[in-house]
Swiss-Prot record:
Alphabetized UniProt keyword annotations: Ribonucleoprotein, Ribosomal protein, RNA-binding, rRNA-binding
Taxonomy, superkingdom: Bacteria
Presence of keyword Cytoplasm: no
Molecular functions (GO terms): rRNA binding; structural constituent of ribosome
UniProt xrefs under PROSITE patterns: RIBOSOMAL_L21
GO cellular component, one term: ribosome
Function according to Swiss-Prot or TrEMBL: This protein binds to 23S rRNA in the presence of protein L20.
Quaternary data: Part of the 50S ribosomal subunit. Contacts protein L20.
Protein name per the record: Large ribosomal subunit protein bL21
NCBIfam families: L21 (TIGR00061)
Protein family per UniProt: Belongs to the bacterial ribosomal protein bL21 family.
Amino acid sequence: MADTKPAAEQSGTYAIVEASGTQIWLQPNRYYDIDRLQAEVDDTIKLENVLLVKDGKGTTLGQPYVKDATVSLKVMAHRRGPKVIVYKMRPKKKTRRKNGHRQELTRVMVESISVGGKAIS
């Protein structure tokens, strides 16, 4: 039986980048929700804080960043995450406090991962 996965998934191409104060594992042609970025819908963003790149040839680990490595992201939409309820109460007292929070998110599609100006995906 033939493998029906895309070529990027078969070879295991991915990059770990630093964005919005967190480290994110990104694979080509997939979308991710990350903390809100200051960009318009359909803009292309280049992330240069690439910590690790893995392709069919091997793994490149940065110290702390991989030299000349970039990840291109396309902004698909701005959205809000699920509501998180924070409820605080003091037992045996009438003190109760309920707050809600929805995180502002940006949905991005990984267009390409490139090292040294050459796209690997």
